[in-house]
Amino acid sequence: MSAPIYLGVIGVGGVGTAFLNQLARLPNAPKLILLARSSQTLLSPTPSYSPTIPAAEWKTAVETPSLTKSGALTPDEIATYLASAPGRSILVDNTSDPALASNYPVFLRKGISVVTPNKKGFSSDLSLWKEIFAAAAEGKALVYHESTVGAGLPVISTLKDLVNTGDEVTRIEGVFSGTLSFLFNTFAPASGSSSAKWSEVVSQAKELGYTEPDPRDDLNGMDVARKLTILARIAGLDVQSPDSFPIESLIPAELTSLPSSADGIAQFMARLPEFDSQMAAIKEGAEKAGKVVRYVGSVDVAKKEVRVGLQQFDKDSAIAGLKGSDNIISFYTRRYGSNPLIVQGAGAGGDVTAMGVTADLLKVIERL
């Protein structure tokens, strides 16, 4: 019988809740001994690390007298607790917290593997990226972060397979944001036409829950830039940070200084119609050339160039033909020649992102 594996989970938002639902349905699931949210931590009591936290009933488990309750713990405290478990342990970080991500090396050096959709650790300063993987080697731990790009789509695993088998990746190009995919597929469809104004489409996306609470967090292009940073690094480029290459922001310059408060968001949405003519001109310029405009990211590995912004595409191209909020990522390589290897599908949503996390967890369990 294989030794038990212990699990700590941080974050119970949309992705975290979906992950716990999937975890509860796994046969032979690892033992859930720590569940942390912003202000409270639930723990299996030491030294037995038993009973464990029921993933299916995690919301009511806080009432269980045999479990230990605590306030928020520091990353060091969580790492010490998990490292003392009577078997290998895994941390699943379902947050987007940069402070927690910067502490991944602390966990990895203690032999705690890390599984996460949190982009911050892998797309911030290059020194942290290098430290994460050095710490994993030192602690004989594993790091899986498939869901940092493309939610549950096999983007990172596909790129790693290409690189690890000796293929030469020359270019990566695609639509990496479900939000921006929806915005442009609606605003400038490849088939038919749309009379919707840009501000109306942004409002619609916000109401449907496609955007971040502050749509500027999507429109500034930084989310796409972080994903491109991760892929470029896997492809062998030492990208220093996501702001070390050109990013075309879709936030009008006049609105960049509005605060990120609820009032600032309301002001942004109220004033966005003032700039509809600018986006209409971009759309019409593409139409006159028989094309459509899309927001894409690209990595030119040979030229060592990364770029994020608007680009025109033929209406019959795969990128132009995307529907809804789908992502598409094309890998151009020596082996695949002029026909790229394409990964396409839903690139956003709690369930599909959690699926990527759960699949990574299973891969780590297989390898421990």
Swiss-Prot record:
Ligand binding (NADP(+)): 15, 95, 119, 209, 212, 349
Residues where NAD(+) binds: 12, 14-15, 95, 349
Disulfide-bonded cysteines: none
Amino-acid positions noted as binding NADPH in the UniProt annotation, renumbered to this chain: 15, 59, 95-96, 119, 349
Residues binding Na(+), per UniProt: 146, 149, 151, 153
Cofactor field: a metal cation
Cofactor binding annotation: A sodium ion is seen in the structure; a metal ion may subtly affect the relative position of the nucleotide-binding region to influence enzyme activity, and could increase the stability of the enzyme.
An MF annotation (GO) of this entry: metal ion binding
Induction: Down-regulated when grown with elevated levels of potassium chloride.
InterPro entries: Asp/hSer_DH_NAD-bd (IPR005106), Bifunc_Aspkin/hSer_DH (IPR011147), HDH_cat (IPR001342), HDH_CS (IPR019811), HDH_short (IPR022697), NAD(P)-bd_dom_sf (IPR036291)
Keyword Hydrolase: no
PROSITE patterns assigned: HOMOSER_DHGENASE (PS01042)
Catalytic activity: L-homoserine + NADP(+) = L-aspartate 4-semialdehyde + NADPH + H(+); L-homoserine + NAD(+) = L-aspartate 4-semialdehyde + NADH + H(+)
Sequence positions that bind L-homoserine: 212, 223
Enzyme class: oxidoreductase
Enzyme Commission no: 1.1.1.3
GO biological process: aspartate family amino acid biosynthetic process; cellular response to osmotic stress; homoserine biosynthetic process; methionine biosynthetic process; threonine biosynthetic process
Pathway: Amino-acid biosynthesis; L-methionine biosynthesis via de novo pathway; L-homoserine from L-aspartate: step 3/3; Amino-acid biosynthesis; L-threonine biosynthesis; L-threonine from L-aspartate: step 3/5
Keywords tagged on the record: Amino-acid biosynthesis, Metal-binding, Methionine biosynthesis, NAD, NADP, Oxidoreductase, Sodium, Stress response, Threonine biosynthesis
Active site residues per record: 227
PANTHER family: HOMOSERINE DEHYDROGENASE (PTHR43070:SF5), PTHR43070
Role summary: Catalyzes the conversion of L-aspartate-beta-semialdehyde (L-Asa) to L-homoserine (L-Hse), the third step in the biosynthesis of amino acids that derive from aspartate (the aspartate family of amino acids), including methioinine and threonine, the latter of which is a precursor to isoleucine; production of homoserine leads to a branch-point in the pathway as it can either be O-phosphorylated for processing to threonine, or O-acylated for processing to methionine.
Family (UniProt): Belongs to the homoserine dehydrogenase family.
Protein name: Homoserine dehydrogenase
